[in-house]
């Protein structure tokens, strides 16, 4: 459905309702991709990989390699205690000349974890990750970890929504769009 509003905004809504088209002051069309963390988790899954603070960094790096992820949550007594990433390993172990086999996760993990709820928008998450220079966001509701999203997950989401929007626009223009 194509509608207009006072700000010369046109919204093209289709089953996923993941895009809005805006016309700027010069009449140039701009596509805004929308969506929530919940949408990403439904698509990617909510499997969470973690380590305990008392495991060695070597064990954490092995697990990251085994699961093909760049970060692991650190769980202690069933609660989120921190996050450890490849970046933590590089900066706090390799560059300091430490051994990953004798250094514990609790010594290098990031304890102050930035997290979001599943209702946060993709845009809000991208902004939060960019401002804080982080690559992974735990998704938490009522102190329960629901999943983790990476900047790569957000980029994949945006690209897929752009492709879907282009397809719908092409169908709309060619009159093949359902009314």
Which residues fall in each region the model found?
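Tandem CBS (Cystathionine beta-synthase) repeat/Bateman regulatory domains
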Residues: 2-179
